[in-house]
Amino acid sequence: MNDPHNNFDIDSLRVASEHGDCDASVRLGQLLLQRGGFGSSEFDEAITRLEQAAGMDHTEAQLLLANVLAQVHALPDADARAAHWYDAVAQKNHPEALARLGDMYLTGRGVAADDAQALARIERAARQCYPQLQCDLAYMLDHGIGCNADPVAATSWFLRALAQGSHQAAFALGLRYYCGRGVGRDAAVAQAMFECAAGGDFPDARVWRGRLDEITSSNEKSDARLLAQRIRDQVRSLPHQFAAAGISELDSGESATRKMTAVIERHWSALDDGRISLDPGHRGARGNATGWPVIAAPGLPQLEIWQPRVFRIPHFLSEYERAHVIALSAPRMAAAAEFSRDAAEFEKDFFTGTAARLGAHMCDPVIRNIERRIAVAAMLPARHIEPLSVLRYQDDDVYEAHVDYLTPDRLEGAHGGQRLVTFICYLRAPREGGETEYLNAEHAVAGEPGLALLHYNCLPDGQPDEMSLHASRPVIAGEKWLLRTAIHAQSLYEPIAAARDAT
């Protein structure tokens, strides 16, 4: 079937754009971007057309332009220009722009790094009743990103997201009620939350529901089933409450947000269960659990082998972080040759599973916090880290023997220079098989959930280490999910010319 976009008359759109039609400029920009990437004449014209409309305060053009610039790191001043246009849209209280600008403050791209500014932007977006952004805000509050850690406030924001049907929030709350993080421990409420999360197929929710089933009493099980059903019924009836209040999906602005917030709070309070009240004063006991399964507890890297240099870090990711990364990447899984143009020619010959790359537009506070943790473990700046990717191995899938350092032909002109260190972390470990094997060292590492491996692709003098040849053995039973990245010798977020000058 032909792409219907090709039926548009490019020349007519150009004429309309030149006469100041902002909608035409945006449509033309979209079509040109589909036809050519960075470095093409189509890309250059698309940027020009979008800048024209953005300069006329066209919100869609400003946001699209910012999204494009934020992903083209080789373009001079791209980050600063992206931040400028995100800020222009954020001043209109646009939730996506607020979230993306918050991300730039987290990374220090285009603006000075400032976690407090990031938190402020993401909170403004979350207050507009967006469950995903409420989960992002809760995570930041829980981890003290831009503030002092506040597990109680984090629990309240997760509950607000749950009140709107977020399965991610339900999973997070299951963990919190299980261990007592910002709320009193309550096995029945925890099991009810995992039941709600499992209803939306949120990763690992069924596993945790099964764990709770083994330790709860018959009365707690009955309480959990009843509470889960009441929560589901309440969420299903929320749209009717919005309709009764005269709120439609198209409503926006501060007035609509106030109305929606009032309806959500009133409707949730009708459950009349203090254990899950949005008001922390009504929730009673406040647990002070500080670690697993809600908060990651990685220790110092432990030596695995010297040749090649491989270090292991148990408990690198929390249960929530692992499930979140799987949920984020699962809908985008594709064969290796499809998910990354840069790696396709190299990777498709070695890897038989599927993968997803977490590009800038997919990154959130969880991903950025993981990147920071990786940077600390590798003792290299976060700006040297490749965008994270996720690999999924099913039955018999393998990653054949390969090295991760860039060979001379691939290193020439590579943005960021040599890949000094490879990082992998098990999101899920198979029941059998799937070990990471260092062939020249005749050493294999069996995976376990949350285990991270750092292996050095280069010797201390910077030369490639041929001992780093490694592979993944076939998965025999279960699935293997890996979070993966590489840390380069130089920043990946500098224009190409500037990066070359630095060398």
Model-derived regions, located:
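Structural signature of tandem alpha-helical TPR/SEL1-like repeats
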Residues: 2-11, 38-49, 74-85, 112-121, ...
